[in-house]
């Protein structure tokens, strides 16, 4: 190619067609769709797939997360009027129904005894 020379466009049969938006869905029927371009789609989709049926979304759903520390007040235990003591942690999945028999690492197991 010589610089400065204008070349004719290739014939219609040799042109590469431009892809229209969402055209991939027509060409790739049966294939996995592409991920949309958004900044938090990966985390949103990941959380949605891990959300447990029947539980609110604010419960911890990853095993390495803990709910915030709480204070347990046990009425009628020890001193009259109840005692309150801070607990530095609560067991994983403490609020979920099946966690009552499996307290896991935490501080509620010694309070249930």
Curated annotation (Swiss-Prot):
Tissue-specific expression: Expressed in fetal and adult liver.
Note: Encoded within 3' untranslated region of IGF2 last exon (exon 7). However, might be transcribed separately. Parallels IGF2 mRNA in its abundance.
Protein name according to UniProt: Putative insulin-like growth factor 2-associated protein
